[in-house]
Amino acid sequence: RQMSRVGIVTDSAADLRPAVARELDITVVPSRIQIGDRIWMDGPDLRTPSFYRRAFASSETPRVLPPTSQQFVDAYAHLAQVSDAIVSVHMTSALDGTVRAARRARSLLGQRCDVHVLDSRFASVALGMLVTEAAKAAQGGAAASEIERLLRGLIPHTYCAFFVDSSERLERAGITVEGCSGEKWDTQ
């Protein structure tokens, strides 16, 4: 059997270190951060102490915007040149429109490449762990359908908790989920 090349894509909500993304050949499509009228691309270069000071000192609430469909089209088209298929794993659709943008990009790309878009149901470290497992499977020669099956098996057994001092900033940024105020948060 000829080994196929599967490209792995995620978004910056996976919080992957750049060295890990490079080592595992993961394409990270950046979210966008909006404060007032300015928009920045998310990523390690943006996440500096001076940016955080500016963001939290601003009277405007920072908003995280999902990547655009065009950002995904560009990433998929680039990977399609060297891949037989793409597995694109993203932040939970309960929090933002990243999965929707990725699915739209898949339809805009048409038949140029087989793209599998998965809603991880998570963000941050849990998403990063799932993406890392997908990349390791791809490097091991797994087909896209095998990687998708692996992730669908891992998702129900993955758990994530996070804590904030106050949900006020989350609510102002528009990332509130019903039942998230101090209770167990289950997006399934």
Task: For the regions a language model picked out, list residue spans one by one.
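Short, Lys/Arg-enriched N-terminal segments with co-localized hydrophobic residues
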Residues: 1-2
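Mixed-charge interfacial surface used for oligomerization/domain docking
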Residues: 5, 13-27, 31-32, 94-116, ...
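Residues that mark the start of a beta-strand
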Residues: 5-7, 85
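N-terminal glycine-rich anion-binding loop in soluble enzyme alpha/beta folds
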Residues: 7-71
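Aromatic side chains
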Residues: 40, 51-52, 72, 76, ...
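Glycine/charged-rich beta-loop-alpha catalytic/anionic-binding loops adjacent to active sites
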Residues: 54-57, 83-88, 108-119
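Hydrophobic residues in alpha-helical segments
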Residues: 55-56, 80, 138, 171
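Glycine-rich phosphate- or other oxyanion-binding loops that anchor nucleotides, phosphorylated ligands
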Residues: 57-95, 100-104, 148, 156, ...
